Design a protein with these regions (language model features):
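Methionine residue identity
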Residues: 1, 34, 40-41
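Polybasic, lysine-rich low-complexity intrinsically disordered segments
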Residues: 15, 27-30, 48
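Conserved N-terminal alpha-helix of the aminotransferase class I/II PLP-enzyme fold
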Residues: 123-158
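PLP-dependent class I/II
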Residues: 46-62, 67-72, 79-92, 98-114, ...
């Protein structure tokens, strides 16, 4: 639209708005006459007028929550990865924690059996069917000797991510402050941003063996409590940690619960990788601590333990007030996971658990191959005690370029895709996350590619 036409559209727009301000049913003929007169005088196509009106109106609309979200840095690597594959390149993909193995057959069989029952195809229950919540209670009793009230302290979720985001939506008031480790699984911080809250980032420092530097972590919490206004209302913890693989022992949670009770904040614990452990390590639960239910909830997912990532099943348990808030918001938002999936998940949690050890053994072997072959290639990495990741510091010659540019370079030159550490927080920029989702031979091939890349 030229400048002259724009001026005429603006003239028409202002006059029409003036006419509409005095609009009454009995004056409709006058308004129509005004429109026809203005069109004739200005010699304008009606489409230009409509486009101008809506462009002006919609340009004024802002989406404040979306504006607060940072750019999703993983998208840049994903786009580059797809471009390489479209060009015919063989990309070895360690970028996403997406299990590549099959769901154990007895779980699949139960799903099929349940699907073949017509009554299971209707709406389900937003908090999860009672049998699944009972299975969650059985799992916690067997693994942690923790008793749960199935009606007040357990909600089944569509994966742990859905449950976490909806919990945060339910409990966050505008301006509430949450303490979140950095680096962290991105939604752990961004859920509070979406809910209108704010985030105080706690630097996650590790010991040489990648256990958590607990002294430093508690020091950072105490500083946040002392210096922040308003005082933090929530703390998020995630061990075994994604992305760093950091682990803790039960005394860590005992001290954390004591501080939370004293300082009056809630703890949201994520133990998504609780079963993927190696070398005798056993993941503790915060709910093992006496009195933890006063201040804490905990989430878990079947995605990694049973290779059920696409099934979208998890649960959240613990503090009855927080669980009640999650249950209430879910009652408005969904009707629960497809019932046959819940039935099959019940079997997963309660029947033969040998499949869990088999899946864990697959990751242990991959871990050993990855650590050994990467070190031999000239990239020193630390062997994790848990999770499906290796948190690898960028080799010294490339560290100054940052994790995003290094990830791009590794992809284009070595044909190996990893996740840049900056995507998990500013303190992760010296690292990349490597997911153990390719088989052992592919891992060895990646190491050969990396060795050549580092030498060049």
């Amino acid at each position: 639209m030229g400048a002259e036409t724009s001026e005429r559209v603006a003239f028409w727009h202002l006059n029409l708005r003036a006419a509409l301000c005095h609009f009454r049913v009995e004056n409709i003929r006058k308004v129509i006459d005004m429109i026809l007169f203005l069109l004739m005088m200005q010699q304008l196509p009606i489409l230009n007028i409509i486009n101008f009106h809506y462009k002006t109106m919609f340009d004024e609309i802002e989406f404040d929550k979306i504006k607060r979200l940072p750019k999703y840095v993983f998208a840049a690597v994903n786009e580059l990865k797809m471009a390489e594959r479209r060009a015919g390149e063989d990309v070895i993909d360690f970028s996403m924690g997406n299990p590549d193995g099959p769901t154990p057959q007895h779980i699949v069989d139960k799903l099929i059996e349940s699907i073949n029952k017509p009554r299971t195809h209707g709406y389900s229950v937003s908090k999860g069917i009672y049998k699944l919540r009972g299975a969650v209670g059985t799992w916690y009793k067997r693994k942690y000797n923790v008793d749960l009230d199935l009606d007040r302290e357990v909600v089944a979720t569509m994966g742990s991510k859905e449950g976490y985001v909806h919990l945060v939506q339910a409990i966050t008031n505008p301006g509430d402050l949450a303490m979140v480790p950095d680096p962290c699984y991105p939604i752990h911080s961004q859920a509070f941003i979406l809910a209108g809250g704010n985030v105080h980032r706690l630097k996650l420092e590790l010991n040489d063996d990648f256990t958590l530097d607990e002294e430093g972590f508690f020091r950072n919490i105490e500083k946040a409590l002392r210096e922040s206004s308003p005082k933090p209302k929530y703390l998020v913890v995630n061990f075994p940690n994604n992305p760093t693989t950091a682990t803790v022992e039960l005394p860590f949670y005992q001290k954390l619960v004591d501080i939370a009770r004293q300082e009056r904040f809630y703890i949201i614990s994520d133990i998504a990788y609780a079963e993927l452990t190696f070398d005798g390590y056993v993941t503790p639960s915060i709910l093992q601590v006496p009195g933890a239910k006063d201040v804490a909830v905990e989430s878990y997912t079947l995605s990694k333990t049973y290779n059920m990532a696409g099934w979208r099943v998890g649960f959240m348990v613990g503090n009855a007030k927080l669980i009640g808030a999650l249950e209430k918001i879910k009652s408005w938002l969904d009707y629960g996971t497809f019932t046959p999936i819940q039935v099959a998940s019940t079997i997963a949690l309660t029947e033969d658990q040998s499949c869990v050890q088999e899946i864990c053994e697959v990751y242990r072997k991959r871990r050993d191959v990855m650590v050994k072959s990467f070190i031999n290639a000239g990239w020193p990495v630390v062997s994790p005690r848990a999770s499906m990741f290796v948190w690898a510091q960028i080799p010294e010659p490339f560290r100054s370029m940052g994790s995003l540019e290094f990830s791009k370079k590794l992809l284009t030159e070595a044909k190996v895709a990893v996740s840049p550490g900056i995507g998990f927080g500013a303190y992760g920029d010296d690292y990349v996350r490597v997911a153990m989702i390719e088989n052992e031979e592919r891992i060895r091939q990646a190491a050969r590619n990396i060795k050549k890349f580092l030498r060049e």
